[in-house]
């Protein structure tokens, strides 16, 4: 709504790197040389996107660091996935509802049954978001945080494909190179993680 959609999507590309760094610093996770190469491929994709978008990703970094910290905290909590998401929802729901009603009141729309459809879509989107958050919380407790990070490239990549092929947004050579680097990194990292798991 503020014209920062590109930076927002860029932030979700940076987040996996933040998750990997946090896993290394705060959870003592270590990587094989092959995994380090995969991580460097991901770094190359971020640099490539930066050149493609020609921007200083201030908002992107804020999104990446805050969501990375959120996931790290989740990985240390003792609550189950469902319990932790339920607590978060109970705390944030009143704030979200108050903001929505206040915002629409400022627009002179006190009759909420007559509010345009996007208001109700926002209300329902919270329920739809709950499922992925529960699965995310489950993942942070059951696999390494670095692996959580590298798998997070799937989400922005799918968003990117939707934007390109459904919304017909521009797709250039820089974007293609970035996607190639990202998926090379994902395949190498996942393959190496699977190999190491079989050796244990």
Language model features with spans:
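C-terminal transmembrane-helix exit sites in multi-pass transporters
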Residues: 1, 14-34, 157-176
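Helix-helix packing/entry segments at the starts of transmembrane helices
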Residues: 9-14, 81-91, 130-165
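Hydrophobic/small/kink-forming positions within alpha-helical transmembrane segments
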Residues: 16-21, 68, 97, 126, ...
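Hydrophobic transmembrane alpha-helices of multi-pass small-molecule transport proteins
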Residues: 34-50, 63, 174-193
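Membrane-interface helix-cap regions at the ends of transmembrane helices
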Residues: 42-55, 93-117, 164-168, 189-193
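Transmembrane alpha-helical segments that form core, pore/gating elements
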Residues: 50-108, 200
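Hydrophobic alpha-helical transmembrane segments of multi-pass membrane transport proteins
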Residues: 62-69, 73, 106-147, 187-188
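C-terminal-most transmembrane helix of multi-pass membrane proteins
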Residues: 153, 157-200
């Amino acid at each position: 709504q503020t014209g920062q959609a590109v930076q927002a999507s860029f932030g979700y590309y940076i987040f996996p790197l933040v998750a990997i760094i946090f896993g290394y610093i705060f959870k003592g996770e270590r990587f094989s040389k092959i995994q380090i190469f995969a991580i460097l491929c991901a770094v190359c994709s971020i640099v490539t996107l930066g050149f493609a978008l020609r921007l200083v990703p201030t908002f992107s970094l804020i999104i990446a660091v805050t969501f990375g910290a959120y996931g790290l905290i989740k990985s240390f909590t003792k609550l189950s996935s469902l319990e932790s998401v339920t607590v978060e929802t109970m705390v944030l729901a009143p704030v979200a509802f108050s903001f929505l009603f206040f915002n629409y009141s400022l627009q002179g729309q006190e009759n909420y049954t007559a509010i345009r459809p996007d208001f109700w879509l926002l209300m329902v989107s919270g329920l739809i978001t709950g499922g992925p958050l529960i699965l995310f919380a489950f993942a942070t407790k059951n696999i390494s945080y670095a692996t959580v990070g590298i798998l997070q490239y799937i989400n922005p990549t799918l968003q990117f494909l939707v934007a390109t092929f459904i919304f017909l947004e521009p797709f250039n050579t820089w974007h293609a190179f970035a996607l190639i680097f990202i998926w090379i990194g994902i395949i190498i990292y996942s393959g190496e993680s699977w190999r190491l798991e079989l050796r244990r």
